């Protein structure tokens, strides 16, 4: 049996920027002294004249990206999620979001899977922050195939986009030949009648693993991949909730303000349903290997399985 291919989505980001750079002269990449870590260094090597290192000044980087957008460029500003969404929030909101400029934010090292860098660098709040900015699209791809498609879709989209990428290498679960990406459209990975599991990012694969374990116990779980958290695919969420009667959300992010909150917002208005949110529960991260932290914070397939089984009791 062949080993499952694993790739970090930050690598997908950097490699796709190079591909797009060859196709489009107006693409410009900005970084904040982290080109090696965000993987935009490969773009810098290929197109040094279109790569701008802004130094450790993320707010300034957002302002520069905004200015470039007004000149017809398509800037991708890149940094760790903690800095792109956290430190630069004011400038992203006021300089990019308010005028609705065509800036793309490539945020790497999101969530607890950042690992050894610890709590100060593990951003579990970025989705919540970016969701609040009017007109901001928020995308959290689950694997290499989806990440590459998301970067391309972000380039084609006219307006601000926040792209969330990870440091940890994760299984490639999508087929590059058949996969289709559309902003705002969720993907049903497995049909089911007893409960709907809605996942995003690296938790999508874990949700699929949990569904296999649930099936062995006679629980038929529907699994949905929500790569676009804003705008949310409300039609799919509502229809699935009405079909199964119970919903579980899974995310490598705080349960406050992320995917779970977005799903609850939609269902409370259109189809009140019992929902269990699985994620980071009102706490900070800690230092340790990314894969081990996923297990400790109970975001792995077996932990999800146990929680869903308890929810169904």
Model-derived segments and their meaning:
Residues 1-164, 169, ...:
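Thiamine diphosphate
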């Amino acid at each position: 049996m062949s080993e499952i291919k694993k790739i970090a989505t930050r690598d997908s980001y950097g490699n796709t920027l190079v591909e797009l750079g060859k196709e489009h002269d107006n693409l410009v990449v900005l970084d904040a002294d982290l080109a090696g870590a965000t993987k935009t260094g490969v773009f810098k090597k290929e197109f040094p004249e279109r790569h701008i290192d802004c130094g450790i000044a993320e707010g300034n980087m957002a302002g520069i990206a905004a200015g470039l957008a007004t000149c017809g460029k398509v800037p991708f500003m890149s940094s760790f999620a903690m800095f792109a969404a956290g430190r630069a929030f004011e400038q992203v909101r006021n300089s990019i979001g308010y005028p609705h400029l065509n800036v793309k934010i490539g945020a790497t090292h999101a969530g607890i899977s950042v690992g050894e860098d610890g709590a100060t660098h593990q951003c579990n709040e970025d989705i919540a922050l970016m969701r609040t900015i009017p007109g901001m699209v928020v995308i959290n791809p689950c694997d290499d195939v989806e990440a590459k498609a998301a970067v391309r879709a972000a380039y084609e989209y006219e307006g601000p986009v926040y792209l969330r990428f990870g440091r940890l290498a994760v299984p490639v679960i999508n087929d590059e030949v058949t996969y289709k990406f559309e902003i705002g459209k969720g993907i049903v990975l497995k049909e089911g009648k007893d409960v709907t599991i809605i996942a995003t990012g690296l938790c999508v694969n874990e949700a699929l693993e949990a569904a296999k374990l649930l099936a062995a116990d006679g629980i038929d779980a529907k699994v949905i991949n929500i790569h676009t958290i804003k705008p949310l695919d409300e039609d799919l969420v509502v229809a699935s909730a009405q079909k199964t009667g119970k919903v579980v959300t899974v995310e490598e992010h705080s349960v406050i303000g992320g995917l779970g909150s977005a799903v609850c917002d939609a269902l409370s208005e259109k189809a009140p349903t019992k929902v269990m949110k699985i994620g980071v529960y009102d706490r900070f991260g800690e230092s340790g290997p990314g894969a081990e932290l996923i297990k400790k914070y109970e975001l792995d397939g077996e932990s999800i399985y146990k929680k869903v089984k308890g929810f169904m009791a």
